[in-house]
């Protein structure tokens, strides 16, 4: 399984409290992720406010439990510079071999599923399925058609 995580409203924290506070929050989130996953799972800071987790879980129900555990742990308020910060994360998951035969495919599909979580609102997870890809292609085609209309 690949999980793709994106902190919700991280830019607001960076912009209002400064990049040092944002960096502290990233470190706290990393510790919370370590506390949430199983031994042997691999966590990486993907960049910015994104993380990935590589897990040997390949069962949908176990994936849901892992995502729920992460959401619960991240949601616990933290103190940075004497200010209480409520944090949440959007998660997308893809499962080997159903969703991809290699890590690139799994990351791409987990990222798409994470985007769906973002559109649902913060603090949620989505397990990838083929309907996500179909909906994204429909949206892309609609945007292309709208641009054609605007430009004509």
Predicted segment positions?
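Conserved long alpha-helical elements within nucleotide-processing catalytic cores of c-di-GMP signaling
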Residues: 1, 8-38, 44-48, 52-53, ...
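ATP/adenylate-binding site constellation spanning eukaryotic-like Ser/Thr protein kinases
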Residues: 7, 48, 90, 122
């Amino acid at each position: 399984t690949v999980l793709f995580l994106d902190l919700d409203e991280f830019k607001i924290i960076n912009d209002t409290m400064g990049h040092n506070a944002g960096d502290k929050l990233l470190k706290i989130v990393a510790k919370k992720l370590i506390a949430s996953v199983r031994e042997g799972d691999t966590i990486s800071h993907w960049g910015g406010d994104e993380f990935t987790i590589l897990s040997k879980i390949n069962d949908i129900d176990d994936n849901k439990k892992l995502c729920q555990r992460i959401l619960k742990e991240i949601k616990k308020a933290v103190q940075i510079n004497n200010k209480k910060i409520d944090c949440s994360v959007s998660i997308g998951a893809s499962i080997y071999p159903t969703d991809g035969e290699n890590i690139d495919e799994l990351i791409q599909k987990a990222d798409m599923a994470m985007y769906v979580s973002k559109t649902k609102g913060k603090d949620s997870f989505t397990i990838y399925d083929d309907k996500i890809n179909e909906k994204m292609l429909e949206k892309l085609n609609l945007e292309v058609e709208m641009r054609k209309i605007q430009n004509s």
